[in-house]
Amino acid sequence: MYQKILIRYGELTLKGQNKRDFINDLKRNLMFHIPKEQIKMEYDRAFLDFSLTNLDALKYVFGISSYSCVYEVESSLAAITSKVLDIAKQKYPFKTFAIAARRHNKNFEMNSNDLNRHLGCAILSNFEVKVNLEEPDLKIYVEVRDASTYIFIDYIAGLGGMPLNSAGQVLHLMSGGIDSPVAAYLLQKRGLRINFLNFITPPHTDEKTTQKVDELIKVIAKYQGSAKLYQVNFTDIMNYIGLVSNQKYKIILMRRSFYRIAQMLAKKLHIKALSNGENLAQVASQTLEAIHTVSAPITLPIFRPLLSFDKNETIKIAEKIGTMPISILKACETCELFAPKNPIIKPTPEEASELEKELDKLPELEKLAVENVTIKTISTL
């Protein structure tokens, strides 16, 4: 029976003076899922008490390069040799093997090379097998540390990236499509905690549509324990923008309004960046000119992690993280309801600003939308 789960840190091993802060962020992330007393953080490794529950939890923790289920023995040559032979006995028959021993404890009686030879000879003396350092049937890893030695036979890939919260927070414009949940996941991987903003247009968007967004956020929230969803009633603004003289600009003006509202809300919440699931030139509103025009009134950075992705790349991630089955459910999206037959492909900020002069009540309506935002906490714990 395994005693521990050994965790290897991801990029945070490169972070110099800030490394302790990143390790503390990782510990807090682990504590979303695992009791504090079962976690031990060290400078280059973390250790968890072994359980299937703890093992499963690591699927939702960023900042981990890899992890292994390990046997823990005292750091003595006799104890290490005994456990290595025990593992070999459990795995036999096998034709070839290799030993990969590392001595972190410099006071240990053998160096790494001598320990490799000693353990290899012990197996050769007890089993009819051969050494194969390139592609062995069985490879046994040994890490000799100060208090204990950890022995294991495989590496499990972690999510990589940076620990959640290590990069701050972002306000993410969330829809029920395929792209925006995947974009949120990728931002989490870079250490950002996600706050979600969703625009609804009752009675056009029904309960089924809002439930779909809630379910998508539940999937993404697994990686951060819980998430705040800010919901804005956009019906009055949508109808008002619909009065503009150049109907081809409706989607552009709507998206500019989205971002002005998002920026006002973000500043109110002391959040320093916005984000979305936009992809360059995927649809009419995502040409370079459209993105430039929509972003023109905004001073906060707007993160677009999917900007250069092929749709198939995005779908692959959506399937992997479990959002795809929810995203493809039929629902009424605000953008779809409002789209003109022939949207403009190459808008300009100047033309958009001129058209907004026709809508003199727009700033007041946007301010009102922020004041009346509804807040929902979505938790998966």
Swiss-Prot record:
An individual GO BP term: thiamine biosynthetic process
Primary enzyme class: transferase
Q: Which InterPro entries match?
A: Rossmann-like_a/b/a_fold, ThiI_AANH, ThiI_fer, ThiI_N, THUMP_dom, THUMP_ThiI, tRNA_STrfase, tRNA_sulfurtransferase_ThiI
Q: Which residues form a coiled coil?
A: none
* Enzyme Commission number: 2.8.1.4
Tell me what reaction this enzyme catalyses.
Answer: [ThiI sulfur-carrier protein]-S-sulfanyl-L-cysteine + a uridine in tRNA + 2 reduced [2Fe-2S]-[ferredoxin] + ATP + H(+) = [ThiI sulfur-carrier protein]-L-cysteine + a 4-thiouridine in tRNA + 2 oxidized [2Fe-2S]-[ferredoxin] + AMP + diphosphate; [ThiS sulfur-carrier protein]-C-terminal Gly-Gly-AMP + S-sulfanyl-L-cysteinyl-[cysteine desulfurase] + AH2 = [ThiS sulfur-carrier protein]-C-terminal-Gly-aminoethanethioate + L-cysteinyl-[cysteine desulfurase] + A + AMP + 2 H(+)
Q: Which GO terms describe its molecular function?
A: ATP binding; CCA tRNA nucleotidyltransferase activity; tRNA binding; tRNA-uracil-4 sulfurtransferase activity
Q: What does this protein do?
A: Catalyzes the ATP-dependent transfer of a sulfur to tRNA to produce 4-thiouridine in position 8 of tRNAs, which functions as a near-UV photosensor. Also catalyzes the transfer of sulfur to the sulfur carrier protein ThiS, forming ThiS-thiocarboxylate. This is a step in the synthesis of thiazole, in the thiamine biosynthesis pathway. The sulfur is donated as persulfide by IscS.
The name under which this protein is listed is: Probable tRNA sulfurtransferase
In which broad location class does this protein mainly occur, judging by the first location in its UniProt entry? cytoplasm
Source species:
Metamycoplasma arthritidis (strain 158L3-1) (Mycoplasma arthritidis)
Q: Which SUPFAM superfamilies match?
A: Adenine nucleotide alpha hydrolases-like, THUMP domain-like
Give the record's family classification.
Answer: Belongs to the ThiI family.
Q: Mind telling me which GO cellular component terms the entry cites?
A: cytosol
Task: Tell me the NCBIfam families matching this sequence.
Answer: tRNA uracil 4-sulfurtransferase ThiI (TIGR00342)
Task: Summarize where ATP binds, as residue positions.
Answer: 173-174, 198-199, 255, 277, 286
> What are the protein's UniProt keywords?
ATP-binding, Cytoplasm, Nucleotide-binding, RNA-binding, Thiamine biosynthesis, Transferase, tRNA-binding
The THUMP domain covers 52-155
According to UniProt, this protein's pathway is: Cofactor biosynthesis; thiamine diphosphate biosynthesis
Enumerate the Gene3D superfamilies for this protein: 3.30.2130.30, HUPs (3.40.50.620)
Tell me the organism's taxonomic lineage. Bacteria, Bacillati, Mycoplasmatota, Mycoplasmoidales, Metamycoplasmataceae
